[in-house]
């Protein structure tokens, strides 16, 4: 159990180092990749998640919503549900702190130069028009999560013991969902990806912080992925007949 928890923590932290790190690269003043755009960021997220699976194995979830889905289909015991979720959330927080420390000089150089909201969005997902149409944003995030988790569970069923194939498939799934559906909410699909770094942004010594938008964070990336995950698990198990 301890080894599994450490793998969840380590894989999630590494994922967030890749993810928050690439947003630091594209947003902050003085980085070599400033202004590289969303295509660059989404591709890095995708490859980074594949790397995490290469290192820690295909059994890691790195995502409380995925933990819930795997509990529903019987891949993860219900007794492991809360511990795995907590390990993922802690990994998300620590990974964001590591990324901030790596880019601390660039954060300092960006003070008064880079928009505070853009700096906040390095850490967390936020909608295109902030604070409006929560129902639409919730629906979009739930649909993204449904497609994301359904595809991963189906790929895992078909890949069997081939962890390398599964890792590549997951990266492609992240890339496709991000490019095709992520432009509205930023496609969190994962509380550890959003709320973990959002908590880190709350406590890190970054000057001129924007409002952390907790109302949106707790409702949309906080709850919607669980809804999408449950529907995905029922679809994969009940309709596709897997697991």
Segments from the language model and where they lie:
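Membrane-interface helix-loop junctions and terminal tails of multi-pass membrane proteins
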Residues: 1-243
């Amino acid at each position: 159990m301890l080894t599994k928890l450490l793998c969840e923590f380590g894989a999630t932290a590494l994922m967030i180092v890749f993810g928050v790190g690439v947003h630091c690269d594209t947003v902050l003043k003085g980085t070599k990749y400033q202004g590289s755009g969303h295509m660059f960021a989404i591709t890095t997220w995708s490859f980074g998640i594949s790397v995490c699976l290469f290192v820690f194995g295909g059994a890691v979830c790195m995502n409380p919503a995925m933990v819930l889905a795997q509990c529903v289909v019987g891949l993860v015991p219900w007794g492991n549900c809360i511990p795995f979720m907590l390990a993922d959330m802690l990994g998300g927080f620590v990974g964001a702190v590591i990324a901030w420390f790596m880019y601390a000089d660039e954060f300092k150089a960006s003070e008064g130069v880079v928009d505070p909201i853009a700096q906040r969005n390095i850490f967390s997902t936020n909608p295109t028009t902030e604070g409006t149409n929560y129902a639409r944003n919730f629906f979009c995030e739930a649909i993204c999560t449904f497609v994301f988790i359904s595809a991963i569970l189906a790929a895992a069923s078909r890949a069997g013991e081939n962890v390398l194939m599964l890792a590549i498939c997951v990266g492609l799934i992240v890339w496709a969902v991000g490019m095709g559906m992520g432009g509205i909410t930023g496609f969190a699909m994962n509380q550890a990806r959003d709320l973990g770094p959002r908590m880190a942004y709350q406590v890190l010594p970054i000057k001129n912080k924007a409002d952390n938008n907790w109302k949106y964070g707790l409702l949309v990336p906080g709850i919607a992925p669980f809804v999408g995950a449950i529907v995905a698990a029922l679809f994969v198990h009940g309709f596709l007949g897997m697991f």
